[in-house]
Regions:
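Catalytic center-proximal scaffold of phosphoryl-transfer enzymes
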Residues: 1-192
Length: 192
């Protein structure tokens, strides 16, 4: 808060003490509490929740900014931990929806959660496998995966049920294909 106090003084010629800022933040937190409860309830009862976390510094200490978001709301939380308990607390013990995330174990270890992995992370992983192995089949897998995701986005926007079903069939075929069985990393990605 000392830095914020200096910014107000330097940039806006407004004098506010660090303790004054702390009091302001506490009042704002109290006012926002009902909205936070409403957002938590919405997230915990949603059918699909995207989750992610990123490293930040808090008072010089390593911390994580956590995000649980739906199409209508975003719930943020700062913790000094990257442990699975944070995700569990954010979603609540009775969460029954789908968690869309990267491959981090805090999300995948919850057996009762259904998982929908983030398309960008999945494509990035497939691309990395193709680059590292240099195998033509790994490249082919990555290209097909990208194509299916692109087609899936178009089908989702169009709302056409037949198009979405076609994309599902293509994905099922790619996931079930044994053509890539000589590539353990591709096989691992297929199982996800």
């Amino acid at each position: 808060v000392h830095g914020v106090s200096r910014i107000f003084a330097t940039w806006f010629d407004v004098r506010v003490t660090p303790s004054g800022l702390c009091q302001l933040f506490a009042r704002q937190a109290a006012r926002a509490a009902p909205a936070v409860v409403e957002i938590e309830r919405h997230v915990r009862t949603s059918g699909v929740v995207g989750m992610d976390e990123t490293t930040i510094r808090q008072n010089g200490d390593l911390a994580w900014a956590w995000l649980a978001r739906t199409d209508k709301a975003s719930l943020f939380r700062i913790e000094l931990s990257r442990g699975a308990w944070v995700a569990e607390e954010m979603l609540g013990k009775d969460f029954k929806g789908i968690v869309c995330s990267d491959f981090y174990g805090a999300y995948t270890r919850m057996g009762e959660w259904e998982h929908g992995y983030c398309n960008a992370h999945t494509i990035r992983e497939a691309k990395k496998i193709a680059e590292v192995t240099g195998d033509a089949d790994a490249v082919r897998f990555c290209e097909r995966l990208r194509s299916i995701f692109a087609e899936g986005q178009k089908a989702q926007v169009s709302g056409d049920a037949d198009e979405r079903e076609h994309v599902r069939r293509r994905m099922d075929y790619l996931i079930g294909s044994t053509r890539f069985s000589h590539l353990p990393d591709v096989t691992r990605l297929q199982r996800r």
